[in-house]
């Protein structure tokens, strides 16, 4: 079970594995957008500024390839906004408690969830908190390619 509440808009996002995702009791699903250049992508920035380095090339690459970037300020809400189709994708490095509930909601809404860097063999990918990527199924591979290219540049 995953639950995320948005008190500003009185929105309750919830999901149970295998039973779908819901917003205030109504079923939700990711957007049907197929082109990254027409997509809204969300991300966040680290509080520890010494880790900001890789974010800049990624941000630059994503901005060049999508419609726009959003920074809402809550990873859980960013991910839920992907689940309900308000955004097409989200990427960031987080702590697992920041994304666990929202990740289930996004998966149940039809999103693809993974990472844009390699997950160490000794860590379960669903709990790996570095370089998280969540997007609708059409946008996921496009955004993955952009982020991986930015990291290689």
Regions inferred by a protein language model and the residue ranges of each:
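DPxDG-like acidic metal-binding loop motif
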Residues: 1-22, 37
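An extended, acidic
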Residues: 29-153
């Amino acid at each position: 079970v995953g639950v995320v509440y948005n008190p500003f808009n009185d929105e309750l996002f919830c999901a149970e594995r295998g039973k779908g995702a819901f917003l205030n009791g109504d079923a939700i699903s990711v957007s049907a957008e197929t082109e990254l250049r027409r997509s809204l992508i969300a991300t966040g920035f680290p509080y520890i500024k010494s880790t900001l380095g890789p974010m800049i090339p990624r941000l630059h690459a994503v901005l060049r390839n999508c419609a726009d970037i959003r920074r809402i300020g809550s990873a859980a809400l960013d991910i839920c906004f992907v689940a309900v189709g308000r955004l097409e994708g989200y990427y960031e490095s987080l702590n697992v408690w920041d994304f666990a509930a929202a990740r289930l909601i996004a998966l149940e809404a039809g999103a693809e969830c993974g990472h844009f860097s390699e997950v160490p063999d000794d860590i379960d990918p669903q709990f790996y908190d570095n370089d998280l990527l969540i997007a609708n199924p059409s946008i996921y591979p496009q955004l993955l390619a952009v982020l991986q290219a930015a990291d290689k540049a």
